[in-house]
Amino acid sequence: MESSLKIKDIPQNERPKEKLLTYGAESLSNSELLAIIIRTGTQGENVLQLCSRLLSELEGLNGILDASFDDIISIKGIKQGKASQILALAELFKRFRTLKAINNDIKITSPKDLASLLMGEMNELNQEVLKVVLLNTKNIVVGIKDVFKGSLNTSVVHPREIFKQAISKNSASIIICHNHPSGDPTPSREDINITLRIKECGNIIGIQLVDHIIIGNNKFVSLKERGLI
């Protein structure tokens, strides 16, 4: 039966590692690429089947990037070792994405510039994530950091965590950005209150909050453009 098919029982030219060596990494599916990282399956399920189910349960690559250790380890067949491998891979991807933005000297001249930079990543996240985008005196991105995950409110969003990142990079100004998993980027009263609190703290320490961008389903709202900050 297919459910008990082992990798060694799959024709050699169809195995992920052999396909990569023969045709290149770009020829592999997401589950095949992940299978090369994870390497082994579980009883009654080979590594390809495990990775396919993992991607399905986490709703794709965006889900993996958004997942916590507890999210991953709750999936049948995933133990600490495999969960650690997946989290390490996700973190490397996040760091590469940030380095790419920094090395390309991306300049933010409008809310659309920032939305274009982050929308692909944040569009399909399953929970709210608040990022701080760090800018130099020329409005060029020098860093992008995740600072909070989960439902955002003034009791959990601490300005010190945001400005700690800015100070460490000698940032002249910052933009904060978060997503609404509902797909509707309309700012809530809590969103506005958080923004005003961060703006006030920035004024005190001399690091300007330029804007707060909220991303929904292929659309965004700038609180600055709406006159809310």
UniProtKB/Swiss-Prot annotation:
GO biological process, alphabetically ordered: proteolysis
UniProt cross-references to InterPro entries, sorted A to Z: MPN, RadC_JAB, UPF0758, UPF0758_CS, UPF0758_N
A Pfam family: UPF0758_N
Domain spans labelled MPN: 107-229
Organism superkingdom: Bacteria
Keyword Manganese belongs to the record: no
Residues reported in the UniProt entry to bind Zn(2+): H178, H180, D191
Gene Ontology molecular-function annotations: metal ion binding; metallopeptidase activity
UniProt short sequence motif JAMM motif, positions renumbered to this chain: 178-191
Name of the molecule in the record: UPF0758 protein Cbei_0490
Species: Clostridium beijerinckii (strain ATCC 51743 / NCIMB 8052)
